[in-house]
Amino acid sequence: MLKKISIFIFLVSILSSCSGTGSKIKPSITSSNNGSTVLYFTREGGFLAGGILAKIEVDGREIAKLGTKENITHNVSSNYKVKISGAGISGLGIGKDTAAGLDDGKNHFYIISVKQGLFSMGFKINETTESGFKQSQ
C-alpha cells in the first residue's frame, strides 16, 4: 500500500510540474493612456531538460510559470526588475537571466527564449517592440 501511495505522489508531482500558469491566448495589447506600466511576457517554443517551466519574478515576487507558447501580462507601479529562472526541483541549476526597466507609463514587451550550450542551458529574456512581440506569437 505504501508503494502505491509513493508512486501516486511521485506521478502527481511530475505531472503538475509540467503545467504552466500562463495562457495560450494572445493578450490584447492596449495603449497605456492611464499612466500605468504594463509588462507583456511570452515564451517561445523549445523544451529545456524535459519541459522545465520558466519562472518569472518581478521585484522578487513570482508572477507566473510559463510553459512553451504561453503569455502573461503584469502591471507595475514603480521601477522594476525581472528575473527568469527554471521552476521547481527540475529547474535547479538552470541558468538565470534578468532585465530591468522604468515605470514610465508605457507598455514593455519581453520574449523569453531557451539558450543551450554544450554543457549549459538556461533561459534568456529580451525586450522587444510591440510588433516584435506580436510576430513571436
List the predicted regions and their residue ranges.
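Sec-dependent bacterial lipoprotein signal peptides
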Residues: 1-20
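Short loop/turn and low-complexity linker motifs enriched in small/turn-promoting residues
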Residues: 18-137
